[in-house]
């Protein structure tokens, strides 16, 4: 035989080895007509040359592989793994051993595995000696290398290394393939003799066992200590997500999961890692925008305008996570390539069947098995890459989520006051809950989006290969239809932007409502608050969702039609212009390609929508991050030294400083053209020309009327009010303004900021527990008696904002926090206003005086209290934002100015010392003050301190006594950020009554009843229509495919395109009907079902929450409630509907798919049923796992929101105490916990996906195998039917995976409904109105109040706060209510308004039992000026009269009576952004003034006193009420304003019954009667005169302690 014939026989042409060339496996013998005899000749040449690639098949018509070809593959495999193992062996040997590594004994599994590997070496060597084949030399070398590597890895690697895992798996698969041929073919590969065959079987089993031991039982020979979890996971476990199996088994067994059960698989997805990346990239982006590029410079030159480039958050994120973006895109491209390989493989498979049916010489059956195997392996490779792509994209999403959440939170803690005003807490919460979630969900499809252009190009190229130029007909159709669909999608942009703003506004309003729940109940304002919320939610937000839904339905119709239009146009053009029949091998691969084409086509609209959403969200976040911060040094004008200045007597110095409300306004200062002097608008000036100093060890007091600037000065010293920057035109001789502080600062705000924690945690506030000084602190702050009354003492959990505490208790806890820090400078803002007079007197003595606990520190006190002024070293009188008088106490009294008159007028009433007495007292030696001015406890403490000083001085010398005395009151040490204070207590194990209530989490499957309630809320009639329409669409789709199958078979049989007009016309008609039904279903589900359901649940939950008793707000963090109104509502608005739609569609598709397969391949029933058992095994484990993880995630998110909201509200306190890092650490810890849950949950999804896609690929594989098997039977499957069936079998992967995933998502969405329904069914207060028990309109006509054996408690398990109260308050009687802290004064108010309900007895008003009438009728007919004055982010008018019942004249009148008219007249606010956009001439919009002026969130543009006066104005409006309750109503105002208010009350409420709870006993001295409460009981009830006559009375002792009697 000549050389050329030899080459032809061996099949050297590389073209013949092409995967897609059908001739590669049909052998070239067919082409030359070579018979079996020649094939035998060929076999003689199989191993004749070592330089040629042998044929894969032994003969063109036989079903056996060529042994030479198999051996060549084996050699290549051995060579590859030998190199791979050698590389890893070298790496392990060069890796330095850890010195601290602890080695363990060798386990039996390791010994057995080594023995098996050694056996494998012997077996391979035996095969070599039996076969004398050089192939086995490579096998021996590879196995020996594996043996060495097994020995080394045991002591060096924590996991089974990759080369060994892959080698043994590949070796097992290869040996199995050889075993199959050796068992069923006469053309042997290894087993040319009986012993060789036995050794082959043993080698196969042995190789498999080694693999099992390596992958499942590997344990390193040392203890794993500091390795990250993922570093202990081997390759197979990582790619199959097997490392989650223990967790899944645990949840399946217990139906429960805790955070501690989760494996720590975060890796680098922690806040610290991710935030650092984004922060760095954002800083670079900010620098980039400050330096315009070439294009910007050219454009600026051409237009003569400055180009302002905004920093782009997207660019910063892209730069920070470039590696993850690149990996995600690469994996998406791989998935795309493998996906497009499937249609070509299907075509090869169908062509094999066609050749088998219509060719004379039938190809070997092994070729069919080959293509079935290749399709299976391609599918496996596809889903492995697919799941890794998903994992990467979700990891990217979580990295962005954690980084942005941390950045936003840290930014919120640094915002300037003006920025905080522009960006309310609700907006910031929305950025975290809404915007970041939108970005996160965009990331998980990012790879798909970015790979879409590639998919489109590859798909068109593939279609061109099938249809040639006819493809362009489809392309032209797409070009015509796609822009229309794109325009429809683009039209949603405006709606989405508005939707996000509506969500912001709704969240802000809900936050305000929750914060002001008690006031809303006092005023019975539930109805107007719900009306405001309903307007934003139903009329605006849901209306936008409805518009988006209608447009989405139209877009869905258009995009679903595009692939159909393309297929129609392509088929029609091909049939008309090309004389080639549309056979199954063209039609069904084309259908698969059209489906693949629909993916990028369908992704385009969602991509456009999501890009709009994401760009909006990123822009909003970027805008937040660009907001102004108030720098600590304020451009160098503020200097802070953390240590006292030993060379100066001053601790605080403010020189020539003017402070402004807004830096923005300051930056927009107008310039007078002539004088060129810049001025700050008067409305922006907060304080002007301030010169102030405070010395070490002295008390400086700042006094003034309400709104004069006392609190502003305190905040200015803190650095929270911007200092006015001198203009360039200022005279250089003018002094430069400055604020200097020397030493650490403690701040006690006027409105105490209390954490939702224990009392002890609030006092220690991140500092180390010092039992001795802690006891001194609580004693000095008068808290010991409170601790005795609180349910758990200082371990009592106080609730959100300290809601379970009285105003006085909150004030004293806040003061104790400041005192405990042992700071150098104390900034105290009106701390005495909320405490009783006798308590205030003790605090002055024990804390504020020079002999007090912080007497040797600098104290700056803004106050309206006159008694404390006697202790002051300096007194400043402030009015209109400027100091008008200043001096020491003696100087002020001698000057006899306004300040002296104030002191004389109000001071003499309280038995305060005269000027002479003060002078005399001030000359007395301090030692006597020590002995006479302190309680026994305090004296004992001081003696201990003196003894300690003496002891230390003995060692260091008398010359250092001063230093020692200063050092004794040392600064408090901080604890670690994660410190648990409960561990500091010896009794931390005892049962607490007020522990933090964990958010309830139900267990088990979400019941069908939950979904039933949702469907009923959505209107089941419309829902049924949608299901029917969807089912029709699925059936029509099956009909379309069968029509094409039937037509293509006719074309094959007749070798011509049969009746194209009829078949394509029918196909087009079915497509149009399907598209129309799709549109109608989408329109109905979005326009009617979803909006209706969302309206129902939000309305019901809002009403249920607002109608809940006050105990619900006491025990439930606001963040937890907000989570229901933001995340959970967001899920039922958008996520859950899509999930339900997808589930119904997928379920119906599944029924049809299995029906089609079983109709033509009945034997598949055995395979499908068997695999469905496996499928169910995974399903029943996955569903509880994802459900419980979702519940855990929902619970984990609430603390994140609660912590962020809580700390944003207390940002001034956090900043003052330098506690930012601690709160950031706490938030990071919570974010990382939430992220871990999310990462585990998504990896569990991948765990399921890997297994279900294996099942799906197996179904496809067995379908193909059974189809090949039918070729040897009586009824072989036709190529057209094969294409029809395989098209459906290839979709099983998607269907099965989607069914479980979507069902799990439905369960997760069901959890959201479950949580909402839980809040829809909260225990409610009594009915607002009881129709048959409504009192008369004139009730109460007299205002007689009777308590009859009345008792009450705040909650069922707590002790009573009022016990058997028995008293009568007559009509028009003025009753003052006093008592020590915790006596029950405020509880009496709550009882009267039925904020808390009776546990015994009742209250009657004018003979009507208040427990028998509706709450609206009760509260609406009572009037209160509450202790906590709440305002809403609305106009002055809406804050006064939310019902709109009164005229403007009436509103102005009550403002005048409340002494607010002047201030409100001057108020002005800019129009909102919405109003500007709605106006044609936004620049011409005037500012809102007077009643229309806006009150900002939390009343930030009003002082505390002004907010109290606003409450007085509200009370003055209610003229019909005959009962007025004043709950410490004038605590926050100065004495002059208090006098005016008291006079207003006497004149305007003279015909009303008045109950006054007051700290200042002088304000109730003119009351008709005094009610003294003690431990919740009536201790005394008589006229003040009679009570003062009795020196044994409690009232007498209170008056004496407060200095009101001689």
Curated annotation (Swiss-Prot):
InterPro entries hit by this protein: AAA+_ATPase, ABC1_TM_dom, ABC1_TM_sf, ABC_transporter-like_ATP-bd, ABC_transporter-like_CS, ABC_transporter_C-like, ABCC_6TM_D1, ABCC_6TM_D2
GO molecular function, one term: ABC-type transporter activity
Residues covered by region (Disordered): 908-941, 1465-1487
Entry GO terms, CC: fungal-type vacuole; fungal-type vacuole membrane; membrane; plasma membrane
Domain (ABC transporter) ranges: 672-905, 1345-1600
ABC transmembrane type-1 domain location: 326-613, 1042-1308
Gene3D superfamilies assigned: ABC transporter type 1, transmembrane domain, P-loop containing nucleotide triphosphate hydrolases
Keywords: ATP-binding, Membrane, Nucleotide-binding, Repeat, Transmembrane, Transmembrane helix, Transport, Vacuole, Virulence
Family matches, as CDD domains: ABC_6TM_ABCC_D1 (cd18579), ABC_6TM_ABCC_D2 (cd18580), ABCC_MRP_domain1 (cd03250), ABCC_MRP_domain2 (cd03244)
GO BP annotations, alphabetical order: cellular response to starvation; filamentous growth; filamentous growth of a population of unicellular organisms in response to biotic stimulus; filamentous growth of a population of unicellular organisms in response to starvation; transmembrane transport; vacuole fusion, non-autophagic; xenobiotic detoxification by transmembrane export across the plasma membrane
Gene ablation phenotype (knockout): Leads to decreased sublethal intraperitoneal infection in mice.
Protein name: Multiple drug resistance-associated protein-like transporter 1
Similarity comment: family membership: Belongs to the ABC transporter superfamily.
TM regions (residue ranges): 67-87, 111-131, 134-154, 159-179, 196-216, 325-345, 365-385, 438-458, 470-490, 548-568, 588-608, 1015-1035, 1071-1091, 1132-1152, 1154-1174, 1252-1272, 1276-1296
Bias kind Basic and acidic residues: ranges: 923-941
Membrane topology: Multi-pass membrane protein
Main location: membrane
């Amino acid at each position: 035989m000549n050389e050329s014939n030899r080459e032809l026989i061996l099949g050297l042409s590389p073209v013949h080895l092409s995967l897609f060339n059908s001739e590669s496996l049909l052998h070239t013998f067919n082409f030359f007509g070579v018979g079996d005899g020649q094939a035998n000749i060929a076999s003689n040449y199989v191993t004749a040359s070592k330089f040629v690639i042998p044929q894969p098949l032994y003969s063109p018509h036989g079903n056996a592989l060529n042994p030479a070809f198999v051996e060549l593959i084996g050699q290549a495999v051995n060579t590859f793994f030998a190199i791979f193992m050698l590389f890893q062996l070298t790496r392990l040997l060069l890796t330095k051993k850890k010195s601290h590594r602890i080695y363990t004994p060798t386990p039996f599994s390791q010994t057995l595995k080594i023995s098996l590997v050694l056996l494998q070496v012997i077996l391979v060597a035996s095969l070599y000696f039996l076969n004398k084949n050089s192939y086995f030399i490579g096998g021996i070398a590879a196995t020996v290398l594996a043996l060495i590597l097994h020995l080394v890895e045991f002591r060096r690697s924590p996991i089974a290394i990759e080369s060994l895992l892959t080698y043994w798996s590949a070796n097992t698969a290869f040996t199995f393939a050889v075993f199959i041929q050796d068992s069923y073919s006469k053309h042997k590969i290894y087993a040319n003799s009986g012993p060789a065959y036995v050794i082959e079987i043993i080698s196969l089993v042995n190789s498999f066992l080694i693999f099992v031991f390596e992958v499942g039982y590997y344990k390193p020979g040392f203890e794993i200590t500091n390795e990250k979890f993922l570093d202990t996971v081997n390759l197979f476990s990582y790619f199959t997500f097997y490392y989650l199996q223990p967790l899944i088994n645990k949840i399946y067994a217990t139906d429960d999961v805790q955070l501690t059960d989760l494996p720590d698989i975060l890796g680098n997805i922690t806040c610290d890692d991710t935030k650092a990346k984004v922060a760095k990239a954002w800083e670079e982006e900010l620098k980039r925008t400050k330096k315009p590029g070439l294009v910007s410079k050219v454009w600026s030159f051409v237009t003569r305008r400055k180009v302002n480039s905004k920093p782009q958050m997207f660019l910063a994120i892209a730069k920070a996570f470039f590696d993850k973006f690149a990996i995600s895109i690469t994996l998406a491209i791989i998935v795309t390539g493998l996906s497009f390989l499937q249609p070509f493989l299907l075509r090869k498979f169908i062509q094999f069947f066609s050749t088998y049916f219509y060719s004379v010489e039938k190809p070997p059956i092994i070729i069919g098995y080959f293509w079935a195997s290749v399709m299976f392996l391609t599918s496996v490779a596809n889903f492995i890459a697919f799941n890794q792509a998903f994992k990467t994209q979700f990891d990217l999403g979580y990295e962005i989520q954690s980084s942005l959440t941390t950045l936003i939170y840290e930014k919120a803690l640094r915002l300037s006051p003006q920025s905080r005003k522009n960006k309310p807490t609700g907006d910031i919460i929305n950025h975290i809950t809404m915007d970041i979630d939108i970005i996160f969900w965009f990331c998980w499809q990012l790879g798909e989006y970015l790979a879409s252009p590639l998919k489109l190009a590859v798909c068109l190229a593939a279609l061109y290969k099938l249809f040639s130029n006819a493809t362009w007909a489809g392309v032209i159709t797409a070009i015509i239809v796609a822009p229309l669909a794109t325009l429809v999608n683009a039209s949603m942009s405006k709606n989405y932007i508005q939707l996000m703003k509506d969500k912001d506004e709704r969240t802000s309003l809900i936050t305000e409502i929750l914060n002001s729940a008690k006031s809303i109940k006092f005023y019975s304002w539930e109805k107007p608050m719900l009306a405001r919320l309903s307007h934003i939610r139903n009329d605006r937000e849901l209306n936008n969702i409805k518009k988006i839904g209608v447009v989405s339905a139209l877009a869905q119709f258009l995009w679903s039609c595009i692939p159909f239009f393309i297929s129609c146009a392509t088929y029609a053009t091909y049939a008309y212009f090309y004389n080639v029949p549309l056979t199954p091998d063209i039609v069904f691969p084309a259908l698969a390609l059209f489906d693949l084409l629909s993916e990028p086509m369908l992704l385009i609209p969602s991509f456009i929508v999501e890009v709009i959403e994401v760009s909006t969200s990123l822009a909003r976040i970027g805008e937040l991050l660009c907001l102004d911060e108030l720098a600590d040094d304020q451009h160098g004008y503020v200097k802070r030294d953390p240590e006292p200045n030993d060379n100066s007597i001053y601790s605080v110095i403010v020189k020539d400083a003017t402070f402004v409300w807004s830096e923005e306004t300051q930056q927009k200062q107008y310039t007078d053209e002539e004088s060129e002097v810049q001025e700050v608008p008067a409305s922006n000036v907060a304080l002007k020309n301030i010169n102030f100093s405070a010395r070490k060890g002295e008390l400086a007091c700042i006094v003034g009327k309400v709104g004069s600037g006392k609190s502003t000065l305190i905040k200015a010293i803190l650095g929270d009010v911007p200092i006015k920057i001198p203009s360039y035109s200022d005279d250089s001789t003018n002094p430069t303004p400055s604020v200097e502080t020397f030493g650490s600062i403690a701040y006690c705000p006027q409105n105490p900021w209390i954490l939702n924690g224990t009392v002890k945690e609030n006092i220690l506030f991140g500092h180390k527990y010092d039992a001795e000084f802690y006891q001194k602190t609580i004693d000095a702050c008068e808290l010991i008696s409170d601790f005795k009354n609180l349910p758990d003492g200082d371990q009592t959990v106080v609730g959100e904002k300290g809601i379970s505490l009285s105003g006085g208790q909150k004030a004293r806890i806040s003061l104790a926090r400041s005192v405990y820090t042992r700071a150098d400078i104390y900034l105290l803002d009106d701390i005495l206003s909320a405490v009783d007079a006798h308590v205030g007197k003790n605090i002055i003595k024990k804390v504020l005086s020079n002999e007090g606990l912080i007497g040797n520190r600098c104290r700056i006190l803004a106050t309206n209290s006159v008694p404390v002024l006697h202790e002051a070293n300096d007194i400043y009188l402030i009015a209109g934002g400027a100091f008008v008088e200043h001096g020491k106490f003696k100087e002020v009294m001698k000057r006899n100015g306004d300040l002296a008159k104030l002191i004389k007028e109000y001071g003499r009433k309280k038995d305060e010392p005269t000027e002479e007495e003060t002078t005399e007292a001030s000359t007395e030696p301090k030692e006597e003050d020590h002995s006479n001015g302190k309680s026994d406890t305090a004296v004992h403490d001081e003696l201990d301190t003196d003894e300690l000083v003496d002891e230390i001085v003995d060692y260091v010398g008398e010359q250092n006594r001063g230093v020692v005395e200063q050092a004794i009151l040392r600064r408090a040490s901080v604890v670690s950020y994660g410190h648990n204070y409960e561990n500091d207590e010896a009794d931390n194990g005892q049962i607490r009554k007020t522990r933090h209530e964990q958010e309830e989490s139900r267990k088990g499957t979400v019941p069908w009843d939950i979904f039933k309630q949702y469907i009923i809320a959505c209107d089941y009639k419309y829902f049924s229509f949608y299901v029917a329409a969807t089912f029709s669409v699925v059936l029509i789709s099956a009909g379309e495919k069968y029509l094409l199958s039937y037509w293509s078979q006719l074309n094959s049989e007749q070798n011509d395109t049969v009746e194209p007009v009829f078949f394509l016309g029918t196909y087009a008609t079915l497509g149009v009907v399907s598209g129309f039904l799709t549109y109608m279903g989408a329109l109905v589900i979005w326009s009617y079902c979803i909006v209706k359901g969302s309206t129902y649940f939000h309305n019901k939950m809002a009403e249920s929450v607002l109608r809940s008793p006050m105990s619900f707000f006491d025990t439930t963090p606001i963040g937890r409630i907000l989570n229901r109104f933001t995340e959970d509502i967001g899920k039922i608005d958008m996520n859950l509907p899509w999930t339900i739609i997808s589930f119904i569609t997928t379920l119906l598709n599944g029924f049809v798919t299995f029906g089609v397969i079983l109709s033509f391949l009945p034997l598949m029933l055995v395979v499908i049923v068997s695999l469905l058992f496996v499928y169910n095994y995974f399903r029943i484990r996955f569903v509880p796992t994802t459900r419980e993880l979702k519940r855990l995630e929902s619970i984990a998110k609430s603390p994140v929101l609660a912590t962020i909201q809580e700390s944003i509200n207390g940002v001034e306190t956090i900043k003052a105490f330098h506690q930012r890092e601690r709160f950031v650490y706490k938030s990071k810890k919570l974010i990382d916990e939430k992220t871990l849950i999310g990462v585990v949950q998504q990896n569990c999804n991948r765990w399921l996906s890997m297994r279900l896609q294996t099942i799906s690929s197996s179904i496809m594989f067995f379908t193909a195998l059974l189809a090949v098997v039918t070729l040897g039977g009586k009824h072989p499957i036709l190529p057209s039917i094969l294409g029809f069936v395989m098209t459906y079998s290839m979709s099983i992967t998607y269907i099965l995976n989607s069914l479980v995933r979507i069902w799990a998502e439905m369960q997760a969405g069901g959890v959201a409904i479950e949580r909402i329904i839980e809040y829809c069914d909260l225990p409610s207060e009594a009915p607002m109105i009881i129709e048959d028990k409504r009192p008369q309109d004139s009730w109460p006509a007299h205002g007689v109040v009777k308590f009859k054996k009345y008792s009450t408690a705040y909650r069922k398990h707590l002790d009573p706060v009022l016990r058997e109260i028995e008293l009568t308050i007559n009509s028009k009687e003025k009753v003052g209510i006093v008592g020590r802290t915790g006596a029950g004064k405020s509880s009496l108010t709550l009882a009267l308004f039925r904020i808390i309900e009776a546990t015994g007895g009742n209250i009657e008003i004018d003979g009507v039992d208040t427990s028998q009438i509706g709450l609206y009728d009760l509260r609406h007919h009572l009037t209160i000026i509450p202790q906590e004055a709440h305002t809403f982010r609305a106009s002055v008018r809406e804050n006064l009269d939310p019902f709109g019942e009164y005229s403007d004249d009436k509103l102005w009148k009550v403002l005048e009576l409340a002494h607010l008219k002047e201030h409100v007249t001057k108020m002005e606010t800019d129009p909102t952004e919405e109003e500007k956009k709605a106006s044609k001439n936004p620049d011409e919009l005037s500012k809102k003034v007077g009643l229309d002026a806006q009150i900002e969130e939390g009343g930030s543009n009003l002082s505390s006193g002004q907010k109290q006066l606003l409450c007085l104005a509200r009370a003055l409006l209610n003229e019909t009420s005959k009962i007025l309750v004043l709950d410490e109503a004038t605590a926050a105002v100065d004495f002059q304003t208090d006098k005016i208010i008291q006079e207003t009350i006497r004149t305007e409420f003279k015909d009303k019954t008045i109950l006054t709870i007051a700290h200042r006993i002088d304000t109730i001295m003119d009351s008709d009667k005094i009610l003294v409460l003690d431990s919740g009981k009536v201790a005394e009830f008589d006229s003040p005169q009679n009570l003062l006559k009795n020196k044994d009375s409690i009232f007498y002792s209170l008056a004496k302690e407060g200095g009101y009697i001689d």
